[in-house]
Amino acid sequence: MGMRFTHTSTRLLASTALAVLLTAALTGCQTTQKQETTGSLPASSAANSEADWRREVDTWAALYRSHPEDPVNAMQYAQALRATGQRSQAVAVLEQASIQNSTNKALLGAYGRALADVGNYSQALDVLSRAHTPEQPDWRILSAQGAVLDQLGRYEEARGYYASALKIIPDEPTILSNLGLSYALSKDLVKAETTLKRATAQPGVGPRARQNLALVVGLQGRFAEAEKIARADLPPEEAAANVVYLRQMLSQQQKLDDKKLAPGKPAAPPARSATSPAARS
């Protein structure tokens, strides 16, 4: 399946390229997957094609209609809906299921992520806080909470959650990837690169962390190195598409920088990203 990219609604950011970093990792944070990334050049879904996901929608829709109170039916149906871009419907499904299963922590985790997916960050934080307890913290939920705080521009708070998650599972690449992007969003590209390199050095790391690293390296002007990183771990067709996208983002960044430096012209307003069909945490 070709790589696709999403832009979720974000706080004001200084550039289009950094706005892309807030592509919700949360958009791919399913309860059955290890994907809780703040944002990125989203990785492709190796498991399911778009046609596969549409079949999943039909399958789980039937099961959900027959037993809407079953949390597994609701979560699987919502996952398929999110994968096919039907995010608002996924929220509605999980909201109804959470009313009937108010103490099901896995369901609350899925609901919180889905809320973040549609930009309801404050409500997402509230729901995610009920998806685990201080006595039994879940590193995936901690990472998701950090990702939501990053969406709100509360970077220091977000890093506290990532630190707590890393105490539970040290050097987990999805947490490190989020942490690296948190630094990037606050314009500390050196720390971002260091952290993302640490993420990509871990065993079993997925392609997403490498694509995040590629964007951060490119934002520092090392374009050839960024393209080399962007091509890694991908089939030729997807690698080429990823490089094209990387070049587009970096080109937009350069145009904004040139506009800000042009004499006699007001600085360009901060970019907002808009929601579009998604790939990915």
Residue ranges and their predicted role:
Residues Q76, A110, S143-A144, N178, ...:
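Canonical tetratricopeptide repeat
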Residues Q33-E36, P203, P207-A209, L213-S281:
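Terminal, low-structured helical/coil segments at or just beyond the last alpha-helical repeat
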Residues G2-R4, R11-L12, L22-Q76, A80-T84, ...:
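N-terminal leader/linker segments that initiate helical-solenoid repeat arrays
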Residues S66, Q100-N101, A131-E135, I168, ...:
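Structural marker of alpha-solenoid helical repeat scaffolds
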Residues P71-V72, K105-A106, D138-R140, Y155, ...:
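Helix-start (N-cap) detector for alpha-helical repeat units in TPR-like alpha-solenoids
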